[in-house]
């Protein structure tokens, strides 16, 4: 709605949109469609080894015909939190609209659209324990976004169709609960996250933490485990009752390495050995201890069977 709507509403000014190479496919595929239809030209910004977008790279990419910059608040795979406030300030100075995909961030870290210079923001309920299939969009007053679904005047004439009232109320209530407990939840999840990271790095040799170690969501951990493929790890963890993934949920059926990790300069081999674990405020210390008990022998067993694992092991 936002990407297509802005492209349509501001086409007289231009058609140039700026984003990053590590965005969610909801952004990347929509922009690719706009490009294919000749409705937009898109600049895809590089990121550094931690997945961070440089605000100065955004500034350098802005042209007279630039109408929108879209950079996610935090990455869904590696948990890196982007310098959204600084990027928003660059956009504000240049007179360019700024959209952020805040799906991973809302309910997990503090956010303020005014302080962070955000014009457009999207979120979804299931990321903070709300109902699935329900989302919301913030549109700053004065920003033009035409309806992409027409036929009625619902939702301030932005999206036609009978409203899903239980879903809307469920989203609002879940966000209310999450916001009230945000500080305590962040403190708890950060402590558990750091314990998991330290424990894995201590117990498993040749493991790499993907994403920024400090500018990171409190509930995200992503490891690169060399010499084995993540699918094998996931199968064995599943047998032990541990839910994990190798990338985003939306690409769980694909065997291709993560576009996020590749954009961060990680090799295909290491990207194929990525392991993502997501915590919540309901995660317990006992569960972290269980993962630290189960994961190292699984990794060693798989490495012992791997033809690329060095004989004699690794330090």
Identify the function of each model-found stretch.
Residues 1-315:
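Pyridoxal 5′-phosphate
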């Amino acid at each position: 709605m936002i990407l297509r709507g802005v492209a349509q509403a501001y086409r007289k000014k231009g058609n140039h949109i700026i984003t990053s190479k590590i965005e969610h496919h909801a952004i990347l595929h929509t922009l690719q469609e706009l490009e294919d239809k000749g409705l937009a030209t898109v600049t895809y910004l590089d990121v550094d080894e931690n997945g961070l977008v440089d605000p100065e790279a955004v500034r350098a990419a802005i042209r007279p015909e630039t109408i929108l910059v879209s950079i996610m608040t935090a990455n869904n795979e590696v948990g890196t939190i982007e310098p959204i406030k600084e990027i928003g300030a660059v956009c504000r100075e240049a007179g360019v609209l700024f959209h952020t995909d805040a799906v991973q961030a809302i309910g997990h870290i503090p956010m303020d659209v005014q302080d962070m210079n955000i014009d457009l923001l999207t979120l979804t309920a299931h990321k903070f324990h709300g109902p699935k299939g329900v989302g919301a969009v913030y549109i700053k007053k004065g920003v033009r976004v035409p309806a992409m679904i027409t036929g009625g005047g619902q939702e301030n004439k932005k999206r036609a169709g009978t409203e899903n009232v239980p879903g809307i109320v469920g989203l609002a209530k879940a966000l209310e609960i999450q916001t009230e407990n945000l500080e305590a939840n962040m403190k708890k999840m950060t402590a558990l996250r750091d314990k998991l990271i330290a424990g894995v790095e201590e117990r498993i040799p040749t493991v790499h933490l993907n994403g920024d170690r400090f500018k990171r969501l409190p509930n995200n951990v992503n490891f690169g485990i060399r010499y084995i493929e993540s699918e094998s790890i996931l199968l064995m963890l599943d047998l032990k009752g541990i839910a994990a993934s190798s990338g985003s949920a939306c690409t769980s059926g694909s065997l291709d390495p993560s576009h996020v990790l590749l954009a961060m300069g990680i090799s295909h081999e290491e990207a194929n050995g990525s392991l993502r674990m997501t915590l919540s405020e309901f995660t317990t210390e006992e569960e972290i201890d269980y993962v630290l008990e189960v994961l190292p022998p699984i990794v060693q067993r798989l490495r012992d069977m791997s033809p690329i694992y060095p004989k004699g092991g690794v330090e």
